[in-house]
Amino acid sequence: MTLMKGIQLTAPGQFRLRRDLPLPEPKKGEVRIRVAASGICGTDVHICSGDPSMNGIIAPPVVLGHEFCGHIDKLGDGVDEKKVPLGSYVSAEMHEVCYVCPACRDGAFHACQTTKIRGINLDGAFAEFVCVSASNVVPLPANLPVQVGAILDPLGNAVHTTLKTPIKDRTVAIVGYGPIGAMCGEVASFVGAKHIFLVDVADRALERARTWAKVRGLGDKVTVIDARTPNPVDQVVSATKGGVDVSLEISGHPIGINNAIAMTRAAGNVVHLGLPKADNVTIERFSKNFIFKGLTLHAVIGREMFRTWEQMLDLIQKGMDVHELVSAEMGLDDFGTGVDRFGQGLESKVVLYPNGKPR
């Protein structure tokens, strides 16, 4: 039996590097991909720390990792090589959907309620090889760096969130400037947002936001707000004379959710991607801040299959640069260090090389 190495969750909060995992064989309709690079996600941090919110979702023993790119290594039965050529440089949508539920029948595959996710319920990409459905494969441009190819999954979340409602020439608040918030900032800036307010409470996040605005030469189009200061909502409402056109809520924190709603102008849009830790969130002054303003709320989950992927790759091909979001590159053996540093906010994005760093 041919073996490979990979990061396996053995029990909630317990993981280890294994060098004796069976090399996966693609089933009918699947392909096997030799992983070039894979990215550590916030979800991986929650899984590896034993976060109770993941109970009932994860299915150990399972190989972790759902952000990746690589090259097709083997085709399963029934896969047309003309459509999915051997050796192709690809990523993949890791949500394996049912295709028969009401959401899937409406074409909203990303909202499938019986989704299985590779790297969470099914074996994923923190390994030398991974198998996925051929229909989920996304071809990548040959000139796309693997560091970027490895973070397309979260970038897709940011693209889906940011483009949920028109952004060009609009004022935008991004509440929560972690990795996804930073990606939303890149997208909003690239598509022509009039002014962007970056809101956070963490010193490292705020410093990254200021550095990004300076490096991009956006000093007059970006305002960084420390939400620990008095009245962050008033700061935004005053600067915009009534509130932003669009708020993107990425933090998932109850205060962040309320701030996003309160700092949005009448008839504006609030897009929610952040996941609260608690089941229930209280909306303060619900009538005043929400109903009487006639706000529209959008809930975002994952990436639209496959419209978001097409939008994202189009933005990159047109010049949107996200490679600087990757702050650390490591071998698979250093996964524990990578997940710790990412979880502590010391890195904006960590990329792993299961088969060694490509030359």
Language model feature labels by segment:
Residues C41, I180, R204:
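Conserved Rossmann-like nucleotide-cofactor binding loop
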Residues N157, I180, A188:
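Hydrophobic/small residue at the entry helix of a nucleotide-binding pocket
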